[in-house]
């Protein structure tokens, strides 16, 4: 420990004559007797008195004070404040009344106490606290009063003063906890016992001297023991409780207790007490009281009033009170006075809380406000709290509903309002047709209710009284609309009738020109409900007649009848009562099942209108009415048997809606209702939906309400709701709603199948069975696939095109020419197959000499701009003779590049008929097609076409080649059009070539041989063909033009290497082929080649 050298010097001196006294460890107020050695004339109080009578120099005393100030910070500025009035008088007197204590040597055993205190190692705080922040500038000299302007925040409870407001707030929390504990009865009763127990437990456990323990017991105040508890943060376990001073005015006590000479002699070897160090903030203090006060105020501000325990945090003090001082459980009147103690959160509230009225239907959570529930429902994906009063659809947001209502307003003409929905009056003819429909339907619904209840056993008065409450539910049951779950008015719900009346009617903008077919469909719906109600009423009367003797007073109300009616109607009932298996309505055309009749009527728009002959046969009846009549007639036949039979079990399930009577009564009800309400029925002159949409009217979808400008777009859109897919793929199970989707499917997945089948003469072509026709035509083609395909694409093998050079190759242009005949497609495909065979033979026979004779016959047209869109057909078209094309048409241009390698359809590369040699060699499953004019080979038709365009056209040769002047070029002979087949036969017989198959077998080895062998074979074949040609023509070789030909060959090779056409061909092969072609006589050159060379 750090001890000043002056203390060591003082301990080495002789002890004083007078017995020294020990300074008090706590600064609690106490009465201090004056020492006989102290004189009032002493100028100041010395902190350390010399042990021997040898006086120390004044300079040494000053140096000692300066070093002490450097070792430790000044004492804490917070002096003790008296808790009780009168304690100040009991404490040490002021500096004027009592002289300062005589400076004596410190108690020798005080060093042992310091060693015991400093032996503990604190681990709660490692940072050093700056005690200068709490320095009091006006601190008085030891022994005087300590009050100054630094302590500006006094405590109103105990009177302590603090320099900062934060420290005062921490101090005030301890008072608030004490006040709450004192208010309880267990605190008053057990305070004395706990005080005695803690006094006995807080004794010094370490052995100290008897006189020191005695002096501490004398100094303790019995009224209010204020002791610093041993806390985990400040390790004072097993040491004397240090209580800081509680009075602000009282100075720091420096009293000493008398000691005996024996105790002094025993403790003389102990060194002097150094400065006291705080284990939490590493601060040093001169006395233990200052250290205890420092710990009490800064580190442990929360002190327990029932024991010496103190804590640095309020939560630890509260936990200590719950563990060490739990309150007893006396009666509630004594322990818990009114308003003093708050009820814990676990205790139930005395008054019963009202259950929130707004409950979430999805999760069951309840809310007190409606907007809370609305905000909560947004969490659920299926929350559709904004309901449409017309059609019953739900939306998540209000603006969605607002936009949806525009559909009904435009369709029903409700912008001006429809307030008069009663029976039709005198001025009803002036209004729009939708208003007439609404009024007529409303009146007929009331009539239906009267007819349904006409045979009932109840009186007319009772039925009229009960009709007011059940009108809305019965009307909804007739119309097949959902029940009203949002308390909407019946006027709003009746507007939904117009959705049935205006199906496919462009919003009623046509005025009096309403479609009779749509009105007939609406009346069929209402009449079917009426007949079903009558049938249900008759069955109920029969049941009542059997049970009348048992229950004579039992009567069924109108509401009960309406409920039974809705359950009986099934498909026309509410949507909530429908299940997925109930589908009683069947479309007579396609056989699809629907839940209600209005869905069948909406589905009728999908099918194309029948021909005029069929309409005249039916007497001009519209298709919708015919569908309804067929459905009604089909289901009425089953209903007649039900009405006469006694089996009641057949009235359930899908057959329940079919019990509507015969077709005669069905149409009689329609005519009766239509004539009574002044609405005209369907007439032969009524316009069809297609003719109606020709104007400016809009077509609305009856399912979702979307508007379309034409019936075609509506027809395509309705397929989404009805599931109609008329365009089916002939190769797989795919079916599309539009022709474009089937085109894309065939182009993407079935190109090779379509191409292979389109070019085969014996098999019908499946390409585009229903692309140019209507859905009805597509259905006919599906029913008779063989007949339609043979008539459209079938071609007899004996057919030959009239003009081979004038036909166009329409590969890639089929989307632009959907209306062209299918036979032209096949003839064009056959043309290109013939050209492939002939071009292969000419390429094998005449490598370069007679190339322009072939091009002269089939002139290359100007290539139009080819679209970058992927064409419909991009693969090779293999004809009957097994040859492939390398040329473009006059209209279609070149086919887009397709570098994919596809397997050959006919293995071997040559068909069975085998009219000529193949244009390439088979390598694996791919055919390497060789160019007619050069040794270039490729398996892609597109790449070969591009090669021909870049390298073997007059324009490309004009750019590459230099003009060749020759004396023999002056005489030009106009050659007539040669037939390549005749030329082949003529040369083949003279040269010893047996057949084209032998020639193919001789060249088939080129595609799989090594490069050197391939080059040699090509050279031998070319030289052999050239030698035979020379022997036949007997023309000498032109040797004087060898230099010019070499220059042309070099220039052409450089150009071709730049274009990348000869990437896979050796240079010597290209040079030899060009040299062979240059040795041909001038007579054999065509007109076009002669013109190019003449330039």
UniProtKB/Swiss-Prot annotation:
Ribonucleoprotein recorded as keyword: no
Alphabetical GO biological process terms: notochord development; regulation of DNA-templated transcription
Acidic residues biased stretches = 61-71, 1042-1056
Residues in C2H2-type zinc fingers = 153-175, 276-299, 302-325, 358-380, 386-408, 585-607, 699-721, 727-749, 929-952
Using the UniProt record, give the first listed, main subcellular location. nucleus
Q: Which UniProt keywords apply?
A: Activator, DNA-binding, Metal-binding, Nucleus, Repeat, Transcription, Transcription regulation, Zinc, Zinc-finger
Where, per UniProt, does this protein localize? Nucleus
* Cellular component GO terms held in the UniProt record: nucleus
Q: Name one GO molecular function term.
A: RNA polymerase II cis-regulatory region sequence-specific DNA binding
Q: Where is the composition biased (Polar residues)?
A: 665-680, 872-891, 1061-1076
| SMART domains named in the record | ZnF_C2H2 (SM00355)
Q: Known Pfam families for this protein?
A: zf-C2H2
Question: What spans are recorded as compositionally biased (Low complexity)?
Answer: 23-44, 85-99, 534-554, 908-920
- Segments carrying the region annotation (Disordered) are 1-107, 320-343, 453-472, 532-560, 630-698, 743-810, 866-924, 951-976, 1003-1095
Record keyword Membrane present: no
Please summarize what the entry says happens upon disruption of the gene.
Morpholino knockdown of the protein results in a curved body axis. Expression of col2a1a and sncgb in the developing notochord at 24 hours post-fertilization is significantly reduced.
Task: Give a brief account of the tissues where this protein occurs.
Answer: Highly expressed in heart and brain. Also detected at lower levels in muscle and testis.
The family database entries (PANTHER family) matched by this protein are listed as:
ZINC FINGER PROTEIN, ZINC FINGER PROTEIN 219
Its annotated function is as follows: Transcriptional regulator. Recognizes and binds to the core DNA sequence motif 5'-GGGGG-3'. Binds to the col2a1a promoter and activates col2a1a expression. Binds to the sncgb promoter and activates sncgb expression, as part of a complex with sox9a.
Stated family? Belongs to the krueppel C2H2-type zinc-finger protein family.
Quaternary context: Interacts with sox9a.
Per the entry's comment, what about the domains? C2H2-type zinc-finger domains 6 and 9 are important for binding to the GGGGG motif in target DNA, and for the interaction with sox9a.
Q: What is this protein called?
A: Zinc finger protein 219
Organism name: Danio rerio (Zebrafish)
Q: Which gene encodes it?
A: znf219
């Amino acid at each position: 420990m750090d001890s000043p050298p002056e203390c060591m010097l003082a301990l080495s001196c002789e002890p004083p004559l007078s017995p020294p006294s020990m300074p008090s460890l706590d600064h609690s107020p106490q009465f201090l007797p004056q020492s006989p050695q102290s004189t009032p004339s002493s100028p100041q109080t010395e902190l350390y008195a010399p042990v021997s009578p040898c006086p120390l120099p004044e300079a040494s005393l000053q140096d000692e004070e300066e070093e002490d100030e450097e070792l430790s910070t000044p004492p804490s500025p917070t002096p003790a404040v008296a808790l009780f009035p009168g304690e100040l008088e009991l404490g040490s007197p002021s500096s004027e009344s009592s002289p300062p204590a005589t400076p004596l040597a410190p108690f020798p055993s005080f060093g042992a106490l310091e060693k015991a205190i400093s032996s503990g190692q604190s681990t709660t705080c490692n940072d050093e606290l700056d005690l200068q922040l709490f320095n009091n500038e006006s601190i008085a000299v030891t022994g005087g009063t300590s009050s100054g302007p630094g302590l500006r925040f006094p405590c109103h409870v105990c009177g302590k003063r603090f320099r900062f407001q934060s420290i005062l707030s921490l101090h005030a929390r301890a008072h608030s906890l004490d006040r709450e504990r004192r208010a309880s009865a267990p605190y008053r009763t057990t305070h004395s016992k706990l005080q005695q127990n803690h006094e006995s437990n807080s004794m010094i456990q370490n052995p100290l001297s008897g006189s020191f323990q005695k002096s501490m017991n004398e100094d303790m105040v019995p009224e209010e023991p204020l002791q610093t508890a041993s806390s985990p943060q400040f390790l004072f376990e097993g040491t004397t409780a240090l209580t800081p001073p509680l009075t602000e005015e009282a100075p720091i006590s420096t009293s000493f207790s008398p000691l005996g000479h024996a105790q002094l002699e025993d403790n003389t070897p102990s060194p002097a007490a150094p400065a006291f160090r705080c284990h939490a903030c590493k601060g040093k203090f001169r006395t233990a009281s200052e250290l205890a006060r420092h710990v009490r105020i800064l580190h442990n501000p929360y002190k327990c009033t029932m024991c010496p325990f103190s804590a640095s945090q309020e939560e630890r003090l509260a936990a200590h009170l719950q563990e060490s001082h739990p309150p007893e459980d006396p009666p509630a009147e004594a322990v818990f006075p009114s308003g003093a103690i708050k009820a814990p959160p676990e205790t139930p509230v005395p008054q019963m809380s009202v259950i929130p009225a707004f409950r979430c239907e999805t999760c069951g959570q309840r809310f007190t406000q409606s907007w809370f529930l609305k905000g909560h429902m947004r969490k659920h994906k299926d929350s559709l709290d904004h309901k449409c009063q017309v059609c019953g659809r739900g939306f998540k947001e209000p603006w969605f509903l607002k936009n949806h209502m525009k559909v009904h307003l435009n369709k029903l003409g409700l912008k001006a309002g429809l307030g008069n929905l009663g029976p039709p009056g005198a001025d009803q003819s002036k209004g729009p047709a939708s208003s007439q429909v609404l009024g007529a339907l409303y009146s007929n619904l009331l009539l239906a209710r009267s007819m349904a209840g006409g045979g009932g056993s109840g009186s007319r008065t009772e039925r009229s009284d009960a009709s007011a409450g059940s009108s809305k539910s019965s009307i909804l049951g007739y119309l097949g609309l959902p029940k009203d779950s949002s308390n909407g008015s019946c006027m709003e719900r009746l507007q939904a009738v117009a959705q049935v009346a205006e199906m496919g009617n462009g919003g009623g903008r046509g005025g009096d020109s309403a479609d009779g077919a749509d009105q007939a469909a609406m009346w069929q719906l209402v009449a079917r409900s009426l007949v079903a109600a009558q049938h249900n009423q008759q069955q109920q009367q029969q049941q009542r007649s059997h049970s009348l003797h048992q229950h004579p007073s039992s009567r069924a109300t109108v509401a009960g009848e309406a409920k039974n009616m809705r359950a009986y109607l099934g498909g026309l009932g509410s949507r909530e009562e429908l299940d997925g298996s109930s589908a009683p309505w069947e479309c007579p055309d396609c056989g699809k099942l629907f839940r209600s009749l209005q869905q069948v009527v909406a589905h009728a728009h999908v099918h194309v209108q029948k021909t005029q002959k069929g309409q005249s046969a039916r007497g001009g009846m519209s298709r919708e009415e015919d569908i309804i009549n067929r459905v009604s007639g089909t289901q009425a036949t089953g209903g007649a048997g039900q009405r006469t039979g006694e089996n009641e079990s057949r009235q359930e399930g899908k057959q329940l809606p079919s019990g509507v009577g015969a077709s005669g009564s069905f149409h009689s009800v329609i005519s009766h209702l239509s004539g009574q309400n002044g609405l005209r029925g369907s007439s032969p002159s009524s316009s069809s939906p297609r003719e109606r949409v020709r104007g400016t009217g809009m077509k609305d979808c009856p399912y979702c309400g979307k508007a379309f400008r034409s019936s075609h777009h509506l027809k395509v859109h309705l397929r989404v709701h009805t599931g109609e897919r008329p365009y089916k793929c002939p190769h797989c199970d795919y079916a599309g709603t539009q022709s474009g989707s089937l085109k894309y499917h065939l182009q993407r997945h079935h190109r090779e199948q379509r191409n292979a089948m389109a070019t085969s003469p014996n098999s019908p072509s499946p390409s585009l069975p229903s692309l140019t026709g209507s859905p009805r035509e597509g259905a006919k083609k599906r029913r008779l696939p063989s007949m339609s395909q043979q008539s459209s694409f079938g071609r007899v093998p004996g057919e030959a095109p009239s003009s081979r050079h004038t036909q166009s190759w329409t590969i890639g242009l089929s989307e632009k020419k959907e209306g062209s005949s299918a036979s032209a497609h096949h003839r064009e495909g056959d043309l290109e197959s013939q050209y492939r065979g002939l071009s292969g033979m000419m390429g094998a026979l005449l490598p370069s000499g007679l190339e322009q004779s072939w091009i002269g016959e089939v002139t290359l047209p100007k290539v139009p701009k080819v679209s970058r869109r992927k064409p419909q057909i991009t693969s090779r078209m293999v004809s009957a003779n097994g040859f492939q094309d390398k040329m473009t048409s006059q209209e279609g241009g070149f086919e887009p590049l397709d570098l994919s390698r596809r397997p050959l359809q006919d293995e071997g590369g040559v068909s069975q008929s085998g009219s000529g040699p193949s244009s390439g060699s088979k390598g694996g499953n791919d055919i390497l097609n060789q160019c007619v004019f050069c040794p270039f080979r490729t398996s892609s038709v597109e790449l070969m076409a591009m090669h021909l365009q870049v390298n073997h056209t007059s324009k490309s040769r004009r750019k590459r080649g230099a003009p060749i002047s020759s004396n023999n070029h002056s005489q030009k002979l106009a050659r007539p059009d040669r037939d390549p087949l005749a030329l082949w036969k003529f040369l083949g017989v003279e040269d010893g070539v047996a057949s084209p198959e032998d020639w193919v077998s001789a060249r088939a080895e080129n595609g799989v041989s090594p490069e050197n062998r391939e080059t040699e074979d090509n050279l031998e074949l070319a030289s052999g063909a050239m030698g035979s040609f020379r022997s036949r023509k007997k023309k000498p070789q032109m040797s004087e033009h060898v230099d010019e030909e070499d220059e042309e060959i070099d220039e052409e090779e450089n150009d071709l290497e730049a274009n990348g056409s000869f990437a896979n061909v050796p240079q010597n092969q290209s040079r030899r082929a060009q040299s062979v072609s240059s040795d041909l006589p001038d007579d054999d050159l065509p007109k076009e080649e002669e013109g190019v060379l003449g330039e």
